[in-house]
UniProtKB/Swiss-Prot annotation:
This is GTP cyclohydrolase 1. It comes from Acetivibrio thermocellus (strain ATCC 27405 / DSM 1237 / JCM 9322 / NBRC 103400 / NCIMB 10682 / NRRL B-4536 / VPI 7372) (Clostridium thermocellum). Keywords: GTP-binding, Hydrolase, Metal-binding, Nucleotide-binding, One-carbon metabolism, Zinc. Zn(2+) binds at C76, H79, C148. One of its GO terms (molecular function) is GTP cyclohydrolase I activity. GO terms for cellular component: cytoplasm. PANTHER family: GTP CYCLOHYDROLASE 1 (PTHR11109:SF7), GTP CYCLOHYDROLASE I (PTHR11109). It catalyses: GTP + H2O = 7,8-dihydroneopterin 3'-triphosphate + formate + H(+). The lineage of its organism: Bacteria, Bacillati, Bacillota, Clostridia, Eubacteriales.
């Protein structure tokens, strides 16, 4: 679990390190606030995304299932700044084995709630779906703005990073992959 006391002590030291007075009125409760925030935004560190999976059997359904524009936020593990965007999750069931739609969003949420790389986030989501229901194929496309590119360094506000994780037939069959990307892009 998260050690709130260590987080509070570290935040206090950070404030001192940047030249702030952690005992001034506006900062007095900041260490506690940050510790509580960490408990929430890093909750995925202590959750198994497979624990939310619920599998249904829908006779002979082998057509694409897509949930688009799932809002996401995560924390870039390089700078501990947020990246915010959307995830699109697509899978093609095998022999009618399907997953509840809300479970796709829950998997994304759990995996995003930890220090993360966008590339790994999509890959981990795809792997959980593959391992849970063994579909014919999975695609996870993540579009996000990274505040480490907006607030520091290159300072390119509004730029988006797009990553994809493809598995099964969606990776190996060009026509299927093109259909998935067209659906994601609204064409």
């Amino acid at each position: 679990m998260i050690d709130k006391e260590r987080i509070k002590a570290a935040v206090r030291e950070l404030l001192i390190g940047i030249g702030e007075d952690p005992d001034r009125e506006g900062l007095l409760e900041t260490p506690d606030r940050v510790a509580r925030m960490c408990e929430e935004i890093f909750a995925g560190l202590h959750q198994d995304p497979k624990s939310v999976v619920k599998v249904f059997q829908e006779e002979n359904h082998e057509e694409m299932v897509m949930v688009k524009d799932i809002p996401i936020y995560s924390i870039c593990e390089h700078h501990l700044l947020p990246f915010i965007g959307v995830a699109h999750v697509v899978y093609i069931p095998r022999k009618g084995k399907i997953m509840g739609l809300s479970k796709l969003a829950r998997i994304v949420d759990i995996i995003a709630r930890k220090p993360q790389l966008q590339e790994r986030l999509g890959s981990e989501v795809a792997n959980v779906i593959m391992e849970s229901i063994n579909p014919l194929g999975v695609a996870v496309v993540v579009e996000a703005e990274h505040l480490c590119m907006t607030m520091r360094g290159i300072k390119k506000a509004g730029s988006k990073t797009v990553t994809s994780a493809l598995r099964g037939i969606i990776k190996t069959d060009a026509r299927t992959r093109a259909e998935v990307m067209a659906l994601i892009n609204g064409r």
